[in-house]
């Protein structure tokens, strides 16, 4: 009887230890640190809207984590193989992506925008991109949109949006198609008056925090924290810090 009791106690102790370890696990959070103003490197620190939002969520849930920067095109495969626990990188929620990964509730309403050189008077909207060279970031919604809606002369894909902007700046592309907030931020902060946005924002969709399939418990906790941050004003503070206005 004592032997059975000892075994039972040992098993119970091990179970608690495993449970405690899972609870204390440092989460690995994938991010693409070349997507201003959502996530980018400033000095030796990662900053941005997504970075601040996740820090607030982690504080609310008392989660320990580390950021793992990677190219955007590698994020979904990393989630599928569970090499990371979640990802924030301006990831648009789409039905196609939902087949491969899970998403939190939407946390930012975005869209796509066309950017051209400031002296370009030929391209006034996305309708004028047929027969043009268009630069995009690989693995993003801009690629899908361009393939489905634009008869480009050449659709040039780059792993980093900075390379796409450079392609336009050096006149090797006629336009860039990318996420609205990133284009507007680039024009305002680094464009030096050389670029302009044309036309309306396209394909309004939500960004979501991405998880591997089967992460229901963590996802539900994150959704709860997001709701709390919206209700207590923290979300609005972070939004205003990075976009200069209250969310609509």
Curated annotation (Swiss-Prot):
Task: Please indicate if the UniProt record lists Ligase as a keyword.
Answer: no
Q: Where are the transmembrane segments?
A: none
Q: Which PROSITE patterns match?
A: SBP_BACTERIAL_3
Q: Which residues form a coiled coil?
A: none
One MF annotation (Gene Ontology) recorded for this entry: ligand-gated monoatomic ion channel activity
Main subcellular localisation? periplasm
A single GO cellular-component term from the record reads: membrane
Enumerate the InterPro entries for this protein. Iontro_rcpt_C, PBP2_GlnH, SBP_3_CS, Solute-binding_3/MltF_N
Induction of synthesis: By lack of glutamine.
Question: Signal among the record's keywords?
Answer: yes
Keywords assigned by UniProt, alphabetized: Amino-acid transport, Periplasm, Signal, Transport
Subcellular location as annotated: Periplasm
Q: What does this protein do?
A: Involved in a glutamine-transport system GlnHPQ.
Q: Which NCBIfam families match?
A: PRK09495.1
What is the protein name for this chain? Glutamine-binding periplasmic protein
Species whose genome carries this gene: Escherichia coli (strain K12)
The record's gene field reads glnH
């Amino acid at each position: 009887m004592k032997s059975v009791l000892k075994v039972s106690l040992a098993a119970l102790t091990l179970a608690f230890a495993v449970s405690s370890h899972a609870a204390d696990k440092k989460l690995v959070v994938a991010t693409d640190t070349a997507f201003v103003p959502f996530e980018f490197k400033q000095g030796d620190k990662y900053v941005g809207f997504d970075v601040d939002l996740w820090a607030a969520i982690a504080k609310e849930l008392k989660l320990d984590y580390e950021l793992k920067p990677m190219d955007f095109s590698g994020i979904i495969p990393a989630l599928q193989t569970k090499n990371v626990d979640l990802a924030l990188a301006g990831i648009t929620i789409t039905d196609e992506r939902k087949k491969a990964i899970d998403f939190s509730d939407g946390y930012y309403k975005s869209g796509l925008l066309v950017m051209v050189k400031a002296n370009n008077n030929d391209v006034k909207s996305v309708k004028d991109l047929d027969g043009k060279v268009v630069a995009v970031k690989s693995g993003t919604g801009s690629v899908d949109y361009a393939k489905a809606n634009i008869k480009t002369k050449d659709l040039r894909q780059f792993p980093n949006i900075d390379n796409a902007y450079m392609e336009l700046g050096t006149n090797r592309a006629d336009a860039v198609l990318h996420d609205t907030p990133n284009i507007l931020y680039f024009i305002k902060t680094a464009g030096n008056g050389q670029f302009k946005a044309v036309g309306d924002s396209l394909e309004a969709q939500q960004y979501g925090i991405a998880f591997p399939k089967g992460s229901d418990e963590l996802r539900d906790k994150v959704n709860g924290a997001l709701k709390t941050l919206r209700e207590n004003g923290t979300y609005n503070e972070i939004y205003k810090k990075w976009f200069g206005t209250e969310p609509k």
